[in-house]
């Protein structure tokens, strides 16, 4: 989840109240966020530069607060403070309005058809009469960075541009041109660059080079102009220096270019609802008309409040508490959601919720129910056992088998689901036939593939515990991962049971006895084999027959057949395999697929 850094004193001033750290942690928890760390700005710098130096008493305290990923409206101090003020009932829910502007005076953004080749959408808005101080200005910039990193997916979906409107002249145009046709002075630079030159220039920039791939291979680059052909920005890379906002900026023009229109609307709404509080007319935003080449035009931002009806029973039953309509509406008000009792045609009591443009996370009755639970307090919800609780058959069988094998004096181990490619195949004398699920970008060679069997983990466990007295008897019941084209993700989990005996002798008879015991407790009878190796009533029980698996010693291994289906193998582990895992003593091993028995 994203984390924001806010000055403690500024936050408390915005809340209109000071808190001890313990009390503030309680407030955060009750609101559904978390105080992650308490530090200072200088301490952060010292940590980054690895400097050992004592902290000064006058250093500003910084709170690092973890924010839910679905709440972009909380990604800056201003948005967080506003939400907390409403939560502690020190402020009413803001009402956002569009400025009343005549058709002939509204700012225009004209979109050229070429933009469809690279970044087809743009949404805009204006904040009039904004008052910036240094802290608020920095927060305004930080909010853009946080949005870029999260909902904008590192600018690939949406790129935000903010400009001093007084330095520009409308109407504006959004175009897509060859990079050689675009020239402008970028932000924090003094000379003009051609767009293709700018791409090369920023390849050495630690911050901007990670965004270049979004457009650098495109034949056209997106660019925004005003009526005097002054470049506003080259999204998603950099804004122009001409329209850079400063502490003296009063009128801010915000444009968001995007490949995802829905995300662009959310980002724009987050920006304007958070900082319209500091406009000359509080919570009023000036709209911009965006006109496309097909003649269709749209007014942005879309500040419409949409309504949602949620049955009261859904809320109370899901949470597990009994609440009246008045209590629910009061709790929702604390979460910035206006609510009232709905007029229902049937006898069912429902809550009508008015979702403001700042709450893009409220999409379903579940979201409303969650907000009621947060405001009510999770710690206040009585614990109870769900009436419908029932373990899955597979998990219930797994637990019973764990107990039974433990009573056979085997110790349970839990090993990694990931292993090296070599452990999956070569170290088990198996050939690689592209049958393993591979990790795309492994951090370590030890974790580059999903295990296809439990054998590597158990052998590694014994190999690392050779110094302990023998015999070693261990088992594991866990999942392995197989390629599976029938699944939408291309793979599926299978629950396997494995046991290993390591001692002075191979212990083959002990592993064979464990197989028989497992089948006995599962009420699967052993089948009598005829002279022609055909069992009687094959579908009613189990039998074993000679197998030829490379990880086992030839002639000292067997397949387990249950109800006519092969479910696993057991035998004496091949000396080469033991040597690969640095095991000097003989071992016998069993592995079977539990799910195949069900």
Swiss-Prot record:
- In the UniProt record, the signal sequence range is none
Catalysed reaction, written as an equation: tRNA(Phe) + L-phenylalanine + ATP = L-phenylalanyl-tRNA(Phe) + AMP + diphosphate + H(+)
Q: Which cofactor does it need?
A: Mg(2+)
Keyword set, alphabetical order:
Aminoacyl-tRNA synthetase, ATP-binding, Cytoplasm, Ligase, Magnesium, Metal-binding, Nucleotide-binding, Protein biosynthesis
The reply on keyword Aminoacyl-tRNA synthetase is: yes
EC id: 6.1.1.20
Q: Which SMART domains match?
A: B3_4 (SM00873), B5 (SM00874)
Q: Name one GO cellular component term.
A: mitochondrion
Name the SUPFAM superfamilies for this protein. Class II aaRS and biotin synthetases, PheT/TilS domain, Putative DNA-binding domain
Q: So what family is this one in?
A: Belongs to the phenylalanyl-tRNA synthetase beta subunit family. Type 2 subfamily.
Q: What is this protein called?
A: Phenylalanine--tRNA ligase beta subunit, cytoplasmic
Report the source organism: Arabidopsis thaliana
